Amino acid sequence: AYPFRGTYLDGGVHWEKFGGAYPAGLNLGFELPSTQQRPWQQYLGNATVGVGLSWLDFGHKMLGHSIALYPYILLNAIDTEYFQMRFKVAGGPAAVTEHWYTQADQNPDNYYEPTVNTIFGCTINAYLNAGINLNVPITRYLALGGEFGFFHMSNGRTCMPNIGVNAIYGSLGVTATFNSEVKKTPVTFPDLPYGWAVNITGAAGAQKAAIEDPNRFLISSLHAGAVYHVNNWYAFGLGLDVFYNGGITKNTGRNLYCGGYYDFDLNENGEIEKNEENVLCTTCGSERGVDYSFAQKTRAGLALNNEFKFGRVTAILDWGVYFYNPARNLYYDYHKDNHGTVVPKRPLAYKTPHGAGGEEAPHYFRLGAKCRVWDNLYVQTTMKCHLHIAEFIEFGLGYQIPFYKKGCRPEGKSKIFHYSKEWWKE
């Protein structure tokens, strides 16, 4: 049990309007130390796994409270009789009591006013947590501890608004052990018998574009890549990604793309005004009243893939660069910056002069996890971001094809490794 208090890393008007809010709460956990009876326990240095329950007070009545339920893992950094330091990684769903649709004022015109909660747009959000966990044993059954870390909460544009929470925190508490006498004979396992593996994943989800727009737009992706397992818990490689985002559209109130307004001209006072008379946009050639094509809503990129294996669960962290990105020429701010001119298409690599939250970057991150459910079949959930701004959350199904290392293939087996309950005995 760890009571905590923290401070927000977020800035800007969405937080300044609440003035002096600080998060606080209580982290509870039920932990299962390593029994040294499974391969993944050995590979991760006998890590501890647990289930956590957190209660959060966001520090202002407009922001309300939250309850998060999540699995977590503690990776040993220092493990002695008198002191333990472990790295914590956690993630799961969280429910908030206050959001845009629970408040009395739901007028989008008051978006920046202190009368509205623009931090959350729905009840269920994703909760991510990482930090350092410290323990000092006092007796065989009791230890004093502390935890210092970071947590994030948002809905990944499944709902709007989606400013979300980013905070650091510190805590002090106690850990009680109930089975300190239970010991099992450690089992030694061989290394994973495969090196290269091919991943093929299809995923889909929905994105909301703007508060005043009730529609959700289809998003989907296809990934194919190959990774090499450097050791028993880490693999890296390259992958090809193709994304479709139905939210790249003129049929929404979101002002990220040029929408129904095409040309910008200077009026008699030298001010930039929207010109709604022209049929074709002089910047990108788009026709008024005709939505963007399927090709314009599609992106493709080449990504560096990183995988961190925790038994059946694998954490994913990808960084990619687009080599096909028609949407780079469709942004509202890009049209406004080039008012009254015919400009060449942007290069694939370009700066985002209006910062994060404006034009989306020419590169992307993807953070998530996949869980093996049968043989090499897995389910996956990931969040795709441009810089630190989420584009969407997706859910998918995939298959991994691991290839035996030279000299590791059992006689009579194919070149492809297939999981079994006790594969190390084969």
Predicted regions: what is each one?
Residues 3-9, 32-34, 53-59, 91-99, ...:
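Transmembrane beta-strands of outer-membrane beta-barrel pores
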Residues 26-32, 71-77, 89-93, 128-136, ...:
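Residues on the lipid-exposed face of transmembrane beta-strands in outer-membrane beta-barrel proteins
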Residues 1, 47-51, 69, 85-91, ...:
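Transmembrane beta-strands of outer-membrane beta-barrel proteins
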Residues 37-39, 81-85, 136-144, 180-183, ...:
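Repeated loop/turn-to-beta-strand initiation elements of outer-membrane beta-barrel proteins
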Residues 11-16, 62-66, 99-106, 156-163, ...:
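Outer-membrane beta-barrel translocator domains and adjoining extracellular loop/strand segments
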Residues 18-60, 214-309, 313-314:
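Glycine- and aromatic-enriched membrane insertion/assembly motifs of diderm outer-membrane
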Residues 20-26, 45, 63-69, 83, ...:
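Residues that define the transmembrane beta-barrel architecture of outer-membrane proteins
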Residues 28, 166-185, 390-426:
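Outer-membrane beta-barrel "beta-signal"
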